[in-house]
UniProtKB/Swiss-Prot annotation:
Catalytic site: 100, 196
Organism name: Chlamydia felis (strain Fe/C-56) (Chlamydophila felis)
Protein name: tRNA-specific 2-thiouridylase MnmA
One cellular-component annotation, GO: cytoplasm
UniProt-recorded Gene Ontology molecular function terms: ATP binding; tRNA binding; tRNA-uridine 2-sulfurtransferase activity
Residues with site note (Interaction with tRNA): 125, 336
One biological process term in Gene Ontology: tRNA wobble position uridine thiolation
Length: 361
């Protein structure tokens, strides 16, 4: 009997192509599953859920596959969104996509797949998995511009054992071409960007609905002079340049730290200011695809679009590591995910813990 694969269909071109490839080029029985994580009334229609569902219906109809819907809105609010708000209110910059993958897509959605009689879950992530005697390895996607292994660095290893990533060996250009040649309804649909529950609204106008404004000072760290004012230190991220609205200097200003107790945002002037760079950090909430005891040196990404940075890892108990970089790294942000790599293989990841007040190299 042919095995069943359930495709997580978002209404976008990537998951549409996944369903198309599995339907037409494998022997699997293919089902579609649309996952709703946000109630539109919760956020004044911030997510285009209705339009996305219509696109799932169209593509499923084109491919002649059955499709289902599941809502994890309550669980998403409890396990992802609440942590997002708590993190920001405490001055961190959490990554909800990493949390969503771990808590929703590769946990609750996996359970729904089994309820539907599925043997495998397939998604449109640009990454790969490779089994060996120790389980499954998470590998980068071959398209360096679209590789999404970073977002899965916090996902439990066992959650990836029955997962298929058909786009891991393809580029975005190839995926668009496949969609166009197949005449899929989503072939020309734009990629979604940013955080789903924020949509197209400015980040500040969204966050202030949940975390109250609190006016405070913007301080030049070098001179300790007040150079401006803000409506909440939680709106600012280490390394941020835009939105400061500070004049009086030929050099651009960057956020270099925050004092959440005093509600102060610290800035420095110049993109090469030494306080913007760090040589080490602590990571917690660790998740490993290999034994951390086997790792001494590796590379790391401190944010999605950052370069790989060579580093060494020093274990500090069960759920903490000290990461020392070979060269200073700019704008390390507390609360963001850090992913560790050995070449194309993702070794694991964690959450960055670093002082929010400026620290010299």
């Amino acid at each position: 009997m042919n095995k069943t694969v359930v495709v997580a269909m978002s209404g976008g071109v990537d998951s549409s192509v996944v369903a198309y490839l599995l339907k037409n080029y494998t022997s699997y029985k293919v089902l579609g599953l649309f996952m709703k994580n946000w109630e539109e009334e919760d956020g004044e229609g911030l997510c285009s859920t209705a339009k996305d569902y219509e696109d799932v219906e169209k593509v499923a109809g084109q491919l002649d596959i059955p499709y289902y819907t599941v809502s994890f809105a309550k669980e998403y609010r409890e396990r992802v969104f609440s942590r997002f708000l708590t993190g920001y209110s405490e001055g961190y910059t959490p990554n909800p996509d990493v949390l969503c993958n771990r808590e929703i897509k590769f946990d609750l959605l996996q359970k729904k797949v089994r309820e539907l009689g599925g043997d495998f879950l397939a998604t449109g992530h640009y990454c790969r998995v490779s089994p060996d005697e120790n389980g499954v390895n998470l590998l980068r996607g071959i398209d360096p511009q679209k590789d999404q292994s970073y977002f899965l660095c916090g996902t439990r290893k066992e959650s990836l054992e029955n997962v298929i990533f058909p786009l891991g060996d393809k580029t975005k250009t190839e995926v668009r071409s496949i969609a166009a040649q197949a005449g899929l309804a989503t072939a020309q649909k734009r990629d979604s960007t940013g955080i789903c529950f924020i949509g197209k609204r400015p980040f500040k106008s969204f966050l202030e609905k949940f975390v109250p404004n609190l006016e405070g000072n913007i301080v030049d760290y070098d001179s300790q002079r007040v150079v401006g004012h803000h409506e909440g230190a939680h709106y600012y991220t280490i390394g941020q340049r835009r939105g400061l609205d500070l004049g009086g200097s030929e050099k651009p200003c960057y956020v270099v730290g925050k004092d959440m107790e005093k509600n102060i945002v610290y800035i420095v002037r110049g993109e090469d200011h030494p306080l913007l760079y760090q040589t080490e950090l602590t990571a917690r909430e660790l998740n490993w695809f290999v034994s951390p005891k086997s790792i001494t040196t590796c590379s790391a990404k401190v944010r999605y679009r950052s370069n790989d940075e060579e580093c060494e890892i020093l274990l500090r108990g069960e759920d903490e590591v000290l990461v020392r970089f070979a060269s200073p790294v700019k704008a390390i942000t507390p609360g963001q995910a850090i992913a560790f790599y050995d070449g194309e293989r993702c070794l694991g990841g964690g959450v960055i813990e670093i002082s929010m007040t400026p620290q010299s190299v």
